[in-house]
């Protein structure tokens, strides 16, 4: 339920967003066009292995691709694949600021 809301918040903030729940569809989308940033929503500790696999696949294909996990603080300390972490926020401005910070520093 939060993913569509986050997508819309990013769109309203001026970002172009492509979104999917499917790892295979995500890889197809990634192969079809370049992205400034790929956000992988990690839902709890149980989602880490799938998120890390997707991150690894993306980095294998294009090492320079920016990848960030959207997750809570606990998940953030359990993984090291992504370039950065955007903390799960109920504050839309903080979420957008996290995305902007990643893009600005790269």
Question: Positions of the model-derived regions?
Answer:
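Conserved phosphotransfer cores of two-component systems
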Residues: 31-33, 57-64
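Conserved phosphotransfer microenvironments
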Residues: 39-60
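Acidic, metal-coordinating helix/loop segments flanking the phosphotransfer/catalytic sites
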Residues: 19-37, 45
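Short beta-strand elements of ligand-binding domains
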Residues: 41, 66-72
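Short acidic, S/G/P-rich loop/turn micro-motifs used as interaction or catalytic elements
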Residues: 1-2, 43-47, 74-75, 92
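Output/docking surface of receiver
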Residues: 71-106
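Two-component/phosphorelay signaling modules centered on CheY-like receiver
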Residues: 1-18
């Amino acid at each position: 339920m939060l993913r569509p809301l986050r997508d819309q918040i990013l769109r309203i903030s001026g970002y172009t967003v492509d979104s999917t729940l499917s790892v295979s569809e995500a890889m197809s989308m990634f192969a079809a066009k370049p992205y400034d940033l790929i956000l992988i929503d990690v839902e709890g500790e149980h989602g880490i292995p799938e998120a890390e696999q997707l991150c690894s696949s993306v980095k294998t294909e294009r090492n320079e691709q920016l990848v960030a996990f959207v997750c809570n603080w606990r998940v953030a300390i359990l993984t090291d694949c992504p370039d950065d972490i955007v903390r799960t926020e109920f504050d839309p401005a903080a979420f957008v600021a996290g995305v902007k910070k990643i893009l600005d520093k790269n």
